[in-house]
Each structure stands twice: as structure tokens, then as C-alpha cells.
Regions:
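PLP-dependent class I/II
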Residues: 2-7, 17-27, 33-49, 76, ...
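Short beta-strand to alpha-helix junction loop
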Residues: 60-63
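Short, structured beta/alpha segment
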Residues: 9-12
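Helix-loop-beta segment of a Rossmann-like dinucleotide-binding subdomain
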Residues: 55-56, 100
Length: 400
């Protein structure tokens, strides 16, 4: 446990709760926790199945066969990829559980794992919990991530056993095309490295862009697995259900460790997940469209304040470089300042890795009126610091 540092996000969470206890109205962009309702047809299926007396026993660690077949059809319909539901698919209690258990099942003390920096914390600390050594690969502006990945493999001793990837990225919202995965699979085969890809934001995409799956690459299943969670696409974060597909050996390894750790997900939840994957997908498009509208309001408002953040083309996040006058503070102190003075709560980039300390992350979990209120608070803070003249909407400084 000593290898796990205190969770940075707890610091801002505690400050947020303290402010709310004082009666302050805090606009919360900190956690990527969907605020919308799960689509009604999914909830109705859960309620119907939960009424049956034969659905309340232990499930199976791999997941019920009907759901694994639905997962296979989902990949076929979406990516034109064939997945064997018996040997290449497994249901997980959300992707976070699956990622952590997969690393426990496959990594030994002393193994090296390559992880982007910044990255979703479980990508880093799942390996740490398993006793592995993590080598960070910079995922930052102006650096070719694939070249850095290849260099890390060549220079690491012992040779890395696994790389953990996640695109669209949390927290950076960085995206890749299928060509990137083609190069990753070739690289992994050349150096005999396993690839774990987290496709959590497959559906949260904008402006006509589509997120590729690593499973679309011929031969990917020789070296790779991919996780998907229903949390974001279907507003099912609290339901804790997802799945992993791909390499048979890794699927079997995860199934074995899960057979000791859990009895799988509550059966009515799994049947509801079938309804999600096989039902009308307009609800998914509607959820993505809601995030897009929020993205547009937030980015436009920050630009009006002179905070020139990039417009993400996927994910539910805006990865915002700290304006130059505040850059020396680092992300945690800047996040505290936003909370105290603008009444806006964000995630400090340092919580995602050292290379994230120049940024903060906004999660698009507040409605548009609340986002506009947040922009007013940020502008007021900038004005108080002399960066935004009282009569102007713009900061006269180089914020990016």
C-alpha cells in the first residue's frame, strides 16, 4: 500500500465539500461522472428481469453467454470484427475492475509496463498494485507519442511485458486514427509486448469523427485486448458493467483470477446491458450530442476569457493548459485557486501524472447554464488578478 500515493483528487474533493458546507455554490467539473439518466428501455429491462426469482443467484465470472454473444454482435456491427463469444470475450464489473484484475493476473514483480503520461490513474496504479514497474511515455503536445513508445521499448531493461493505451484519452482527449493501432500492433509483435487498450469513450465523439478499435487491425488479437464500458455511452456509470475482448490467453487469465475474486455481475444488470448493446442506439447519439453542446459552450466561454484551450473532438473532457500568469503555481494550486475564487472545481493535471501538471481537466458534467455561470466566475477571477480589464471580455496576455 505504500506504493500508492494519496489520491490527489481527494484534496480538491475535500475542499469542494467544505465550501458546499459553508453554503457556497460550487460548479463541479472534477469527476467524469455522467449526470444524465440511463435510457428508460435499459432501466425497464433491469426492473423486469430483477422481478424474476431465478435471477438473484451467483452469476458466472465470464458473464452470461447471451451477453457475450451480444458483445460479439456489437463488434461485428460496429467494427466488422469477429469476436468469439466463448473464448475472446469476458464481462467485467466496469472496465476499472477488469483492468486491475488483468494486471494482477498477468504481471509479476519486476515486470515493466509502459503507460502514457498523463493517463487515467488505474492504468498506472493497476500495474503498481500488481508489483510491476511503470515506465512513463510522454503524451504531450509537440511529441510524437508512437516514437516515444518505440524508444521506451528499445531502451527498457528488462523488456516491457505490457503497454496500456487509451484513446480517446482521459484526461487529454487526444485521439488517434486506425493507422496508429496498425503501427502499435506491428511494434508489439516485433518486441513481443502485450497491448491493453481502453476504449471507454468510443461513442463520445464529435463533428463526424469516429474512434477506431484496435481490434480492427488484422492480427491484433495475437497481442492485444480491448476494454469497453457502458458507463459513458449509456449513462450507466454506477451500474458497473463493461467487457474485455481479444487475446484468448489474456481473456482466460482474467477469467481465472475473477473466478477467485468475484462471481460476476448481477444477472439482471447483464440482461439490461444486452438491451443497451442491441437496442436503438439513438440514445447513445443523444448523449454524445449533449456533451458536444456543453463542449461548445465551455470552449467558447474560455476563449472569450482569453483562455485559449483546444477544442476536443472526442471524450467528455476539456484538457486546459494553465494560463501563463498562473503556470508557475502547478495544477493543484491553480485548481485550488479556481475553487476558492471562481467557485469552479476542476481536476488538477498532476493527478494523471507528472506530465499533466501544466494542465487542468474539465469534465463536461454540468449543464450549459451552469457552464456559463462558471465562465462568469473565471472571468471575475481573471479581472481581480488584473488580467481582464473590467470593460473587456478578453485577457490581454498570451494564455497559451
Amino acid at each position: 500500500i505504500d506504493r500508492l500515493p494519496p489520491y490527489v483528487f481527494n484534496i480538491t474533493a475535500e475542499l469542494k465539500m467544505a465550501a458546499r458546507r459553508r453554503g457556497e455554490d460550487i460548479i463541479d467539473f472534477s469527476m467524469g461522472n455522467p449526470d444524465g439518466a440511463t435510457p428508460p428501455h435499459i432501466v425497464e429491462k433491469l426492473c423486469t428481469v430483477a422481478q424474476r426469482p431465478d435471477t438473484h443467484g451467483y452469476s458466472t465470472s465470464r458473464g452470461i453467454p447471451r451477453l457475450r454473444r451480444a458483445i460479439s454482435r456489437w463488434y461485428q456491427d460496429r467494427y466488422d470484427v469477429e469476436i468469439d463469444p466463448e473464448s475472446e470475450a469476458i464481462v467485467t464489473i466496469g472496465s476499472k475492475e477488469g483492468l486491475a484484475h488483468l494486471m494482477l493476473a498477468t504481471l509479476d514483480h519486476g515486470d515493466t509496463v509502459l503507460v502514457p503520461n498523463p493517463s487515467y490513474p488505474i492504468h498506472i496504479y493497476g500495474a503498481v498494485i500488481a508489483g510491476a514497474q511503470v515506465r512513463s511515455v510522454p503524451l504531450v503536445e509537440g511529441v510524437d507519442f508512437f516514437n516515444e513508445l518505440e524508444r521506451a521499448i528499445r531502451e527498457s531493461y528488462p523488456k516491457p511485458k505490457m503497454m496500456i493505451l487509451g484513446f480517446p484519452s482521459n484526461p487529454t482527449a487526444q485521439c488517434v486514427e486506425l493507422e496508429f493501432f496498425e503501427k502499435v500492433v506491428a511494434l508489439a509483435k516485433r518486441y513481443d509486448v502485450l497491448v491493453v487498450h481502453d476504449l471507454a469513450y468510443a461513442d463520445i465523439v464529435y463533428d463526424g469523427w469516429k474512434a477506431p478499435s484496435i481490434m480492427q487491425v488484422p492480427g491484433a488479437r495475437d497481442v492485444a485486448v480491448e476494454f469497453f464500458t457502458l458507463s459513458k455511452s449509456y449513462n450507466m456509470a454506477g451500474w458497473r458493467i463493461g467487457f474485455m475482448v481479444g487475446n484468448k490467453t489474456l481473456v482466460s487469465a482474467l477469467a481465472r483470477i475473477k473466478s477467485y475474486h468475484d462471481y460476476g455481475t448481477f444477472t439482471p444488470l447483464q440482461v439490461a446491458a444486452i438491451a443497451a448493446l442491441e437496442g436503438d442506439q439513438q440514445c447513445v447519439r443523444d448523449i454524445a450530442e449533449q456533451y458536444k453542446r456543453r463542449r461548445d459552450v465551455l470552449v467558447k466561454g474560455l476563449h472569450e476569457a482569453g483562455w485559449m484551450v483546444e477544442m476536443p473532438k472526442a471524450s467528455m473532457y476539456v484538457w486546459a493548459k494553465i494560463p501563463e500568469p498562473y503556470a508557475a503555481m502547478g495544477s493543484l494550486e491553480f485548481a485550488k485557486k479556481l475553487l476558492n475564487e471562481a467557485k469552479v472545481c476542476v481536476s488538477p493535471g498532476i493527478g494523471f501524472g507528472d506530465y499533466g501538471d501544466t494542465h487542468v481537466r474539465f469534465a463536461l458534467i454540468e449543464n450549459r447554464d451552469r457552464i456559463r455561470q462558471a465562465i462568469r466566475g473565471i472571468k471575475a477571477m481573471f479581472r481581480a488578478d488584473g488580467l481582464l480589464p473590467a470593460s473587456s471580455k478578453h485577457i490581454h496576455e498570451n494564455a497559451e
